[in-house]
Amino acid sequence: MKRSKKIISPLASFNYHLENYNGLIKSFRKNKDISHIGSMLNDCYTSELTSKIFVEDYDALVLTDKSQKIVWVNDGFNDMTGYTKKFAIGKKPSFLQGEKTSEKVKKQLREELAFNHTFSGSILNYRKNGELYLCKINILPIYNLDEKLKYFIAIEKDETKMNQSF
């Protein structure tokens, strides 16, 4: 009597499918974000902004008016911070800052935005539960067709897992 050999399938194939699934979900979320932003920005929306959002690896998007009050956040904002859209809208993103947030970074951020410049950097923020997280931010000014500042968009990534030195 011959013994049959058992064939064991590696989990690599499962991981491959899981990665593809996660990539597909990210793509759907990005398309949803792009659609929402496009409908809000009307005469300010450009293909450059679409490309930037689609290419960037982000956890949250925050859209503010020119006075830096939040007018829209994506679903990832709640996942990253613990705060709901309803709570965030109308507030300035500085509500996420706290005692350990660098004064130097806050000053640099204020100065760049005061001159309608872009800002790229990392800042320590606080989640709703009080937990610190390191947030990589890329902020872009958005102008209308008359080249007047209308909005800022912050493309944010939680870098806490990559840098635990705070």
Language model features by range: what are they?
Residues 42, 99-111, 163-165:
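PAS/Per-ARNT-Sim sensory domains
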Residues 77-88:
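PAS/PAS-like sensory domain cap-loop motif
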